[in-house]
Structure formats: C-alpha cells, structure tokens
C-alpha cells in the first residue's frame, strides 16, 4: 500500500476530477496542497454533479477526511460559499470531515482588488497574464513577503490588529500607485471578524494530523490543482500560476516528508489545451482545433473560458514526467480523438534552425519554436466506454503505446468517457 499524488502534466484541465474521484473512493484522507479557488473540477457521483474549486474531492464522500494544506491560499468567503452550495446538495461539511491548516494564508478582499487592478493595467499595455482575478497571486506575494494573515491569526484579534497594519502599509502604497482609494484598518478587521467563527472550527495543525494518519496506515491522496506547466518555476513563465504545482509541492504544501508521497500519477490529456495567455507550440487554429474544443467540451469549470486546443505535445509531457518524478500517467479523453483521419504528436522543436528536445525557459525562445511532428493513422471506431484493451481499435492502442514511448512513462489508467467506470486500469496506484 502506498500514498498517491495526483498532478496535471500539462496546462491544467487534464481531467483530474474524474481520476481523483475514482481514487478518493479508496483513500482515507484527501489533501489539497497548493493553489486556491482559481482552478475547479466537477465530480459526478450517483448522477449528481458537484463543482469544487477549493474543497478537496474527498469532502463529498462519507467517511473520508478532507484536508486543506498550508500550501493553499484560502479565500474564506469563497470557502463558506462552496460549503453552502454543497449543503444544498445534501453534503454536510463539518470539522469532522474537513480540516484546514492553521498556517494557511488567507485571501482578503484587497488581494482580489489588486489582482483586478493589475490585470486592467496590463490589458491596456498588452502584457496581461490572464489571471482569474481571484487574488491568488497577491496572496502568495504577501505570504512570501511575510506579511500574510493566516488562519491561526483569526483566533487572536488583538494581535491581528498589528498584522493588519503591516499588510495595509504595503497594499495602500500599491493602491495609491493605481489611483485607487486606500483601505481602512477597520474595513479589514471587520472583514476578518465576520468570518472568524466560521473558519476557526476547521483549523488544525495539519502536518501533525497527517503524520498520525500515516503512522496509522491511512491511505492518503494528494490532490493537485492546475498543471505542471503552470508551475511558477517549471512552467511557461510569466504565464504561470503563483505557486509550485509539481509533485514535490505535495510535501511542502502539506507538511509531510517527500519520502511519504509514494506513487506520482500524472493526469495527461490525449491532446493539449490551454486557457488564457502564453506560448502553445502545437495550438491549432483550424477546423481540427475547433473539433477538439467542441467534442471535448473545452470550457473552464470555474471561469467558463474557452480553452485553446492543439495536438499532443510529448516534449512538454516528457518534461513534466521528469520534473514531477511521475511514476505513471492517467491518459484521459482518448475518445475525443475518435473519427480523425490522422493524428499528430509533437516530439520536439526547431529553434532558430536547430532541433531541440525540450521547450526552452526563455520567453523569447518559446515564442520562436516550431513543433516537430510524427503523424499516426487515426481510427473511425468509437472508444467511448471502453473498459478493457480488447475494446479499443488497433490504431488507438498504437497511439497510446507511442505516447508511452515518447514521454518515458507507462499508462496506469486510461479514461474513455467522463463516466467514472469507463476506465481501463493497468496499474493500481495505491497498490504499486
């Protein structure tokens, strides 16, 4: 038995929700370790759809413990609203099934406002990143700047007052630069006071809790948000998120040592998508790109934004396999490729006349690369609902084997529809 870390191996939206749902049924504890409420997924259980963006997936299953780790930035208002939506659907979220790290950073209204002001200013200059304007980046900045308000701070309003002064010194200077009204001390104190009683009952020393669970033999599932190519260090900077999204963050963002992480499962879409700005070497602007977007229902769970679509980029996923230490992948949305006459896979790039096998880190170089493709024959038969290899067309199997060879990692699971049972299991990550 081992613990499992789920990471996205592309730019997010790889279909983690279904795979995490499938795994969470067998886990005892499900842990979110990075990000905020800027990335979401939909779980379908007994025909009911649950849309989650901040809460770990385990919260919708009876008897599971959901944990929000210290690596997450928590918008208390968004959390309370999400809990409320689940309660309307009959899911009770209590301190019995949800614990939040007492040292997790809080997202405040001033973070959301700063995020929006920056995006507006960047839009005018043509340099916008395309954030969700939810305050994620500014909250992480305050965390690194050692002026953040954390969950534990809500328990001591007297000490909190000085911390609010400190954060306002920074933010009001920025607001003056944008020509915005300054925020008063009273406004932030009232904001925090209004949610303290709702948030504090969930507060926990999470590293200690997880250590006890591990020693007791619990199966722990670490649930990543977004994708590895959005990692602040290893992604397509500056068009990235504000946290580390690679598997190593599961240790730092939860307080468990890296030796306890276990199987690293990379969720990998059979083609490539991206939301927002940034380089995308295999992007398709033709009818095939439109076909993938429409058939794959490529719209964001949280934002509703249309995703850009392109061919599978093995060079990028190969990088993710290396930077995450991926043990095996879950290949999703293979069925979306049904009916195409031919398929292309990017195996490397040309940069200034030279062939290279990885995407360079330089923003300028990323804009100049041209994909090098191999072409495979497509298939006309349907793969929808396939639950064993024998159900797949020969050309689909050939495509999967080519992906495995090019990225240097085996397929552990193969998803053939949004339904959780339409999955071909090759290797059980929890039993590896």
Swiss-Prot record:
One of its GO terms (molecular function) is GTP binding. Binds 1 Mg(2+) ion per subunit. Substrate binds at residues 301-307. Its cofactor is Mg(2+). Signal peptide: none annotated. GO terms for biological process: 'de novo' AMP biosynthetic process; IMP metabolic process. Its main location: cytoplasm. Pathway: Purine metabolism; AMP biosynthesis via de novo pathway; AMP from IMP: step 1/2. The active site is at residues 13, 41. It catalyses: IMP + L-aspartate + GTP = N(6)-(1,2-dicarboxyethyl)-AMP + GDP + phosphate + 2 H(+). Mg(2+) binds at residues 13, 40. Homodimer. Belongs to the adenylosuccinate synthetase family. This is Adenylosuccinate synthetase. The gene is purA.
């Amino acid at each position: 038995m081992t613990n499992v870390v789920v990471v996205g191996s592309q730019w997010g939206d790889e279909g983690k929700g279904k795979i995490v749902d499938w795994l969470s049924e067998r886990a005892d504890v499900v842990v979110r370790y990075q990000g905020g409420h800027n990335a979401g997924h939909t779980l379908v259980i007994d025909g009911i759809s649950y849309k989650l963006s901040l809460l770990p997936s385990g919260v919708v299953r009876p008897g599971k413990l959901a944990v929000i780790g210290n690596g997450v930035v928590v918008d208390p208002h968004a959390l309370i609203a999400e809990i409320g939506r689940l309660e309307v659907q009959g899911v009770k979220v209590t301190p019995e099934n949800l614990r939040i790290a007492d040292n997790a950073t809080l997202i405040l209204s001033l973070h959301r406002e700063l995020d929006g002001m920056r995006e507006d200013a960047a839009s005018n200059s043509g340099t916008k990143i395309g954030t969700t304007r939810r305050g994620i980046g500014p909250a992480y900045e305050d965390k690194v700047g050692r002026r953040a308000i954390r969950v534990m701070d809500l328990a001591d309003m007297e000490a909190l007052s000085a911390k609010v002064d400190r954060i306002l010194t920074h933010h009001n200077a920025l607001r003056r630069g944008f020509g915005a009204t300054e925020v008063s001390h009273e406004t932030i104190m009232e904001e925090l006071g209004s949610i303290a009683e709702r948030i504090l009952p969930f507060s926990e020393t999470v590293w200690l809790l997880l250590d006890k669970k591990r020693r007791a033999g619990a199966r722990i599932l670490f649930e990543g948000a977004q994708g590895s190519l959005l990692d602040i260090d290893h992604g397509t900077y500056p068009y990235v998120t504000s946290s580390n999204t690679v598997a190593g963050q599961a240790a730092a963002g939860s307080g468990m040592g890296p030796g306890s992480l276990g199987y690293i499962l990379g969720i990998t879409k059979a083609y490539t998508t991206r939301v927002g700005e940034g380089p995308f070497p295999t992007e398709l602007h033709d009818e095939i790109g439109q076909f993938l977007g429409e058939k794959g229902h490529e719209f964001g769970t949280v934002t509703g934004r249309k995703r850009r679509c392109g061919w599978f980029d093995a060079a990028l996923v190969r990088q993710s396999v290396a930077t995450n230490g991926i043990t095996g992948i879950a290949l999703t949305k293979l069925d979306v490729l049904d009916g195409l006459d031919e398929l292309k896979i990017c195996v490397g790039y040309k940069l200034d006349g030279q062939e290279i096998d990885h995407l360079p880190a330089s923003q300028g170089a990323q804009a100049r690369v041209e994909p090098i493709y191999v072409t495979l024959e497509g298939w006309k038969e349907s793969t929808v609902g396939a639950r064993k290899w024998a159900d797949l067309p020969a050309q689909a199997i050939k495509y999967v084997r080519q992906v495995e060879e090019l990225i240097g990692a085996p397929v552990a699971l193969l998803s053939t529809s949004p339904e959780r049972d339409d999955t071909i299991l090759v290797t059980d990550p929890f039993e590896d």
